[in-house]
Amino acid sequence: MPASDPRRLRSPLNPSIHSPFVIRQLPFEMDFSATASLPIGFSSLFLLTEVYIRHVESSRRRDISLLSNCWYIAVNTGLWICCLVLSIVALVLRIEAVSLSSCQLAWMQAAVLKASDAQLWQPSADQLQVYHLRILLFLPGESSWPYGVLALVLTACLQCAAAGLCVWDAAPGLTPHLTRSALVPILHVGWGLHYTVFLLWILRICSLKGNDLRHIWKWRVWCLLVAPLFISALVGATPLTLWYPPKITFLFWCRKQQMRWRMLGERGAVQSLRSVSSTVRAQPTSHPYPAAL
């Protein structure tokens, strides 16, 4: 087929079809800067919540300082730095998947908020613990690192790896096929763990009764933790659309249906012509004029 033939296949005008993780034109006139900045707000809010809870604990107990259990504060600070870096990368390179990964890392900070060691939890000591993720999901017991917390840490590592692969996929001159073949299962497993733990946490909240249930519905709890978690879960509901954006998917579906209808119409027309021709052949031929007697 010559190069001047208009039927010759050409590369798509939108290069993001080959690199769907790079957002060059946002659908629905979305403000990507505001979307990518949300994880920074969540992460900063969780870090301030951690410091606030430590302050409340130190003010209630004289034998506990503000910097008690510095390990959890350090983990929150590390997650905040990673979230900040990923958000900046998402803003500069305009990669939506990196923004989702930073949102997931911000949600990860809820797992280490006031996560006590293997000690029995006393509601009278600190009522703020009633909505913490580790207290709600896992009873303090034999191990100081329950399987749920390990799953959350693994989720954070997977999201960091996915963000790195997204940046690699966005770099020019690289083959995206190998990158995407590793990126797709990593994102699937990471978000699968994320939503599994999130649903277990919601079920645990729904099973609370008495004073614990009344404490959950306080506005302070919703402002500090529950509302940002719900928002991050809603934001995280879009990772599957990164490979096939809704607009492109809808257009491909419409084109496929149009081709299917056209093929069905052509097949029906061919069948009708065949039936007409067979009917004409089956009828006896008669002379248009009567035979002369």
Swiss-Prot record:
Membrane topology qualifier: Multi-pass membrane protein
Gene Ontology CC: membrane
Pathway per the UniProt entry: Mycotoxin biosynthesis
Induction of synthesis: Expression is up-regulated more than 10 fold in toxin producing cultures.
Record's keyword terms, sorted: Membrane, Transmembrane, Transmembrane helix, Virulence
Compartment annotation: Membrane
Transmembrane segment boundaries: 33-53, 73-93, 148-168, 183-203, 221-241
Principal localisation: membrane
Superkingdom of this protein's organism: Eukaryota
Additional remarks: Gene clusters encoding host-selective toxins (HSTs) are localized on conditionally dispensable chromosomes (CDCs), also called supernumerary chromosomes, where they are present in multiple copies. The CDCs are not essential for saprophytic growth but controls host-selective pathogenicity.
Role according to the record: Part of the gene clusters that mediate the biosynthesis of AM-toxins, host-selective toxins (HSTs) causing Alternaria blotch on apple, a worldwide distributed disease. AM-toxins are cyclic depsipeptides containing the 3 residues 2-hydroxy-isovaleric acid (2-HIV), dehydroalanine, L-alanine which are common for all 3 AM-toxins I to III. The fourth precursor is L-alpha-amino-methoxyphenyl-valeric acid (L-Amv) for AM-toxin I, L-alpha-amino-phenyl-valeric acid (L-Apv) for AM-toxin II, and L-alpha-amino-hydroxyphenyl-valeric acid (L-Ahv) for AM-toxin III.
Record-given protein name: AM-toxin biosynthesis protein 14
Organism in which the protein naturally occurs: Alternaria alternata
